[in-house]
Design a protein with these regions (language model features):
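Extended hydrophobic-aromatic, low-complexity segments
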Residues: 162-163, 175, 192
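A short, conserved structural fragment
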Residues: 81, 185-196
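Short, amphipathic alpha-helical interaction segments positioned at domain boundaries
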Residues: 204-212
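Minor-groove-contacting beta-hairpin "wing" of winged helix-turn-helix DNA-binding domains
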Residues: 197-202
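C-terminal scaffold of the Radical SAM
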Residues: 1-171
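Short amphipathic alpha-helical interaction segments
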Residues: 171-186
Length: 212
């Protein structure tokens, strides 16, 4: 498994194509690829704000993503999430747990655990963690859990099982998000399969998943 990052300062479409083409020659079964994010107050963000680094423009970043998707598909990699591609049977079970909003355990300083109803975050520093400092606890309200399950589930190419969402949270997503989902469906960004009761991003919508 390898991770790739696109939209780097100074990176152009041709250099990205060479990196993707090189990845296809490696003996890997899983590829994760992420667009670079300039997190506020990080050194890279400050360099961008001062003009020391110039981020890739949105159009180029979309072209990079398109090339990745097309090349992966042509080389036996199935896209199963916005940023993840795998050979048959090689999907990341670890990450699928997150996208399906299932319980998980985190160990070590600053690690987070989730039991389906609450989140527990361990002490941030190693020193405090080794001292046995109590973790912070966050109770997840029903509406919050619903929203988190929806946006995480929509990252998957097969989208969200609306019947499962209703069973877990008692909320009919189609009714609750009627106005928003109708608008995105009309724009060709979301797809509603009434028979299977699944809501998913379209191929075009995958490019704008964070905004949706």
């Amino acid at each position: 498994s390898i991770d790739l990052i696109f939209g780097l300062p100074g990176q152009n479409l041709e250099s990205w194509k060479k990196q993707v083409d090189k990845a296809m020659t490696l003996d890997v079964q899983h590829i994760s690829a992420y667009g670079l994010i300039y997190e506020k107050n990080t050194p890279l963000w400050r360099q961008m704000k001062s003009g020391k680094v110039i981020p890739a423009d949105d159009e180029t970043a979309l072209e990079m993503y398109d090339y990745l998707v097309e090349t992966c598909a042509g080389n036996g990699f199935e896209q199963y999430e916005i940023s993840n591609f795998a050979q048959s049977g090689q999907e990341s079970l670890h990450n699928i747990v997150y996208w399906n909003y299932l319980p998980y355990m985190g160990f070590g300083s600053a690690a987070c655990s989730f039991d389906g109803q609450r989140r527990r975050t361990n002490a941030e520093t190693i020193e405090d963690y080794l001292k046995g400092s109590a973790p912070s606890l966050e109770e997840i309200a029903t509406r919050t859990g619903f929203a988190e399950a929806m946006f995480l589930g929509l990252r998957k190419t097969d989208g969200v099982d609306l019947m499962e969402i209703k069973r877990r949270f008692g909320i009919d997503a189609c009714e609750f998000l009627a106005a928003e989902s109708a608008s995105f469906i009309k724009k060709g960004l979301l797809r509603l399969d009434g028979k299977k009761r699944r809501l998913s991003l379209t191929e075009h919508g995958m490019k704008f998943g964070n905004e949706i």
